[in-house]
Regions:
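Short N-terminal or domain-adjacent regulatory/targeting segments
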Residues: 2-26
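A charged, well-structured terminal subsegment
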Residues: 143-167
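Short acidic low-complexity segments
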Residues: 73-83
Length: 167
């Protein structure tokens, strides 16, 4: 969804494309809250991309029910991570977002990022009032690939976007 598809949130303005690029440029570590070992889940797809050689991010998986995903250790909570992540990238239910925003503030993260389809005004306000950037309804993989030149249009008026250039 585009930013204008949502009701405005008093006290919070969605970051512009330039601001999102700056957030990603300033990021070295990302915690994926709600990471899944199921390859059909968006969190697994995004984690695979973020762990790839095309990014320089340290990626932490957070899920209290798992111990390893994509060969990486999984932590039960943000507080259990070995370092404070720059971005807390959330793949959980919308109603879980305020609590996760509180955790992100408590650990001292820089950015609370809710993935595509997630829009929670309370979480955005908790994050920004706690000194964090707040991004909602945006995908870290798509945004990174977009700014790094990794997204290509399949053709005029097709509506198809791919992360792989066809030859």
């Amino acid at each position: 969804m585009a930013e204008w598809d949502h009701d405005p949130v008093e006290g919070w303005t969605p970051p512009t494309a330039f601001q999102r690029k700056a957030i990603l440029d300033d990021t070295t570590s990302i915690a994926i809250v709600g990471a899944s070992k199921n390859p059909a889940r968006a969190s697994n797809f995004v984690a695979t991309y973020l762990l790839s050689s095309s990014t320089n991010f340290t990626v932490y998986m957070v899920n209290p029910r798992e111990t390893e995903i994509l060969g990486e250790p999984v932590y039960p909570s943000l507080a259990d991570l070995p370092e404070v992540p720059d971005i807390v990238d959330v793949f959980r239910r919308n109603e879980d977002l305020p609590g996760i925003a509180e955790e992100a503030v408590a650990v001292g993260a820089k950015t609370f990022w809710a993935q595509l389809g997630l829009w929670n005004p309370d979480a955005a306000l908790i994050a920004t009032e706690g000194g964090l950037n707040a991004v909602m309804d945006r995908c870290t993989k798509i945004e990174h690939a977009r700014f790094a030149g990794g997204l290509h249009l399949a053709g005029f008026n097709t509506g198809v976007i791919s992360s792989r250039r066809r030859t």
